[in-house]
Amino acid sequence: MALMAVKGPDFCVTSCDGIYGANAYEKTLAMANEIKSRNAQVNMVYILASGIDIDNDACIRAIEDVFGTDVTIFGATSSDNMKGIVSYQAVGDLVTEHGAYLVGFSDPDLKVDTQATHGFVAIGEPLVVTKSTGHVIHEFNGKPAWEEYTRMLGLGSDSNCGDTIPIGALGEKLSDELALEYGNKHLLRVVTKRVGNDMHYATAISEGTELWLTTRDEDLIFTEMDRMVVEMKKRMEGKTTVAVFHADCLARGRFLFNRIIKDELVSKMQYPFYINGECPPWLGMYGFGEFARLGGKNVYHNYTTALYVLYK
């Protein structure tokens, strides 16, 4: 277990319990308002929330409605080793299954640079969302969502999330401009089965949206990781790294001996940020999804490596 300590007057923490898809906006809005009431100078917000069944775009929207769209949101949602059953969040001595917390930072000299990358490629014909409510998908291609999704994966409808999450990333097509910045044509999403054949999507999803099945490309995972680090280092030229937060998906790295080997991937992202031969304070977690900017906006990602470099 790794611990990163933060001290001083320029941060504050708040949390909530009972956050779900339907109330994600209201719960996050209440936390953001509490943060602002304690420190109106907050200019960046770290979030950790339950990852399995909330609407992450609603969380972003709530924070921005309080602090404005210029606030940088970074962090992740918690996972359970890709099982999609239950995840945990801890604040102080309280452990919850459907909780979230925010950490607001207000040091005017402290900045954060964020970026995410995945390295998966889209395959086959898209699934079309033909019926949805908020972040819940009811039908793909006019058929019960879970049945059609598992059929496209070559699995039976009795499969569970532990079977589908490692191989069933869905891709939303990006604009050409965003694809060039992202290094990929698609933004990935994780889905889980909750009630009947309904599926929980990671964000709100509109009817008519096309979603592609994807497959991991090991070479692309590593080349895009290198590209991301190079770009971040260029943007930070002349700056001093203070600390690094890091959120990562378990489905990334070298696939060997029926498991994912992460050591090489982690070393490739850490070494470029060393200062005088030493790694800066670095706190990483395996998550369900990651928050990082794309196209100048706060965006929720899945199946990525995301780095959040705090610097002065």
Segments the model singles out, each with a brief description of its role:
Residues E278-C279:
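C-terminal regions of mature proteins
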Residues W282:
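Short FAD-binding loop at a beta-strand-to-alpha-helix junction that anchors the flavin cofactor
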Residues M1-Y271, M285-K312:
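Small-residue-enriched flexible segments
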